[in-house]
């Protein structure tokens, strides 16, 4: 058994089979977080969805401030993206007491990569969708905590390599 292998970089599936393995299990999980490289993404209160969900689910980060790795959920929360992990993060923030939770996505609902059930459940829980908006900057208050997000309104163009229309 070989674990923690980056298939495609450190070894290929064909190479594993040539080495005598009879089967290959690929567990991709949520993958590595992607940041936007916009001003303000290092302000206090900005988390990758993976970090946010890990702190909440595995480290009891919702027990703010008792937890050694707490997560402070504000009254208003913005989650960037519209995949399954984004839906999980948005719904979790809502359940932890955020009054308004926004999904900010640069494409339209039709291009959202989340499963339809995930979108449906997020809407049922009161998540607010801001489609065709792309984050441009994250602003902070005088203490360094996130206070707002600037977005740029988008229009869809031609489909990209994924088949979804690009902003």
Regions found by a protein language model. Give the residues of each.
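A Rossmann-like FAD-binding core segment of flavoenzymes
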Residues: 1-15, 19-34, 60-67, 95-167
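Glycine-rich dinucleotide-binding loop and its adjacent helix/turn
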Residues: 1, 6, 33-96
């Amino acid at each position: 058994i070989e674990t923690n292998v980056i298939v495609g970089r450190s070894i290929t599936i064909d190479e594993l089979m040539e080495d005598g393995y009879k089967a290959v299990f690929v567990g991709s999980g949520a993958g590595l977080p992607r940041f936007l490289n916009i001003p303000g993404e290092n302000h206090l209160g900005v988390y990758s969805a993976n970090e946010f969900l890990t702190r909440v689910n595995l480290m009891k980060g919702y027990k703010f401030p008792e937890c050694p790795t707490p997560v402070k959920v504000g009254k208003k929360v913005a989650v960037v993206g519209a995949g399954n992990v984004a839906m999980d993060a948005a719904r979790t923030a809502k359940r932890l007491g955020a009054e308004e939770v926004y999904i900010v996505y640069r494409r339209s609902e039709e291009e959202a990569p989340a499963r339809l059930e995930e979108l449906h459940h997020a809407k049922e829980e009161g998540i607010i969708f801001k489609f065709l908006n792309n984050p441009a900057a994250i602003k902070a208050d005088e203490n360094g905590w996130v206070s707002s997000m600037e977005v740029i309104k988008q229009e869809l163009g031609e489909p990209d390599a994924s088949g979804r229309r690009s902003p």
